[in-house]
Amino acid sequence: MSALSPIPLRRLDPGIPVPTRAHPGDAGVDLCTTEDVVLAPGERVLVGTGIAVALPVGTVGLIHPRSGLAAKTGLSVVNTPGTVDAGYRGEIKVCLINHDPRTPIELRRGDRIAQLLVQRVELVDFVEVEQLDETSRGAGGHGSSGGHASLTPGARSAARVAQEG
């Protein structure tokens, strides 16, 4: 797979740094907020990043939360991952949410708030059919593969008994 050419980036706010990687080899580049924001517990807000990009056709920009902020403060991205389509040329904005039940989150202009990853994507077409081929999974979804003790009926009953006891 060949490397992508450098991506054209327009800085809409000269006071905000161009996105960079925290460490060589990191997958994502850090995005910063252009404004001071205080998010109350449970509140969400759409913030600008001060940049616009020209992604090549066949790629997508994915906006992910910064893991340290999520773990330490509860700050996350509402529609994780956010999607930046190749044809979009406007300012990249990030819809943030404060998941902490008690503590407001204070962000200052220039704070790193999210990560942007650029990935190749398959541009597929769909064809309508009357029936899909059979698989061992079938229509099983939303927890059908198990893997978590609290999802088994016996474990749920035992947990209720332990709480009531």
From Swiss-Prot:
Protein name: Deoxyuridine 5'-triphosphate nucleotidohydrolase
Gene of this entry: dut
Any one GO biological process: dUMP biosynthetic process
Organism: Nocardia farcinica (strain IFM 10152)
Family statement: Belongs to the dUTPase family.
Cofactor list: Mg(2+)
Alphabetized UniProt keyword annotations: Hydrolase, Magnesium, Metal-binding, Nucleotide metabolism
UniProt-recorded Gene Ontology molecular function terms: dUTP diphosphatase activity; magnesium ion binding
Function, as annotated: This enzyme is involved in nucleotide metabolism: it produces dUMP, the immediate precursor of thymidine nucleotides and it decreases the intracellular concentration of dUTP so that uracil cannot be incorporated into DNA.
Highest classification ranks of the organism: Bacteria, Bacillati, Actinomycetota, Actinomycetes, Mycobacteriales
Region (Disordered): 134-165
